[in-house]
Regions:
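Conserved N-terminal segment of class I S-adenosyl-L-methionine
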Residues: 1-79, 83
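Short conserved AdoMet
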Residues: 26, 46, 94, 108, ...
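Conserved S-adenosyl-L-methionine
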Residues: 146-148
């Protein structure tokens, strides 16, 4: 990824670093990306886009092509995915354990969860941010939600 492209992509420094880290992942199969109005990460991946299909979920989207899945409610969506992408999503939910259990239910066996959550308030203080998590808390929550 060229830094020129990233600098002029209108992304924050945090988002730029996340994209840089994530772009090396080789995604295959079906993916669902939460909080993604504009296919944020798909646009930056070096992966062959013919090897995977993306679905996007955002509760606030008015785009009818973007499905609405509330990670804090009983999961009615039955489709399973090879990859779940949740960058900058967990800080917007009031119960991380329910959200992580639901993302796990969306994954096929041996599926992968990709994501991050900001730790410093001033770095990403979007509306309706509820929490900040330490690495240890995230690990404990993932284990509690049956992630391996």
């Amino acid at each position: 990824m060229s830094y020129f492209k990233l600098i002029f992509s209108n992304k924050s420094i945090l988002r730029t670093l996340q994209i840089e880290e994530f772009e090396s992942e080789k995604l295959t199969g079906n993916c669902i990306e939460f909080g993604a109005n504009a296919k944020i990460y798909r646009n930056f991946l070096k992966a062959d886009h013919n090897l995977y299909k993306s679905t996007f979920s955002n509760l606030n989207s008015e785009n009818k092509d973007i499905i609405k899945i509330d990670l804090e409610k009983k999961l009615l969506h039955k489709k399973k995915y090879d990859n779940v992408i949740i960058f900058n999503v967990l800080e917007h939910v009031s119960d991380i354990n329910i959200a992580l259990k639901n993302t796990n239910l969306l994954l096929k066996e041996n599926g992968k969860l990709f994501g991050s959550t900001p730790f410093i308030y001033r770095i990403h203080a979007a509306p309706k941010d509820y929490s900040r998590y330490t690495k240890d808390f995230i690990k404990k929550s993932l284990k509690k939600s049956n992630y391996k």
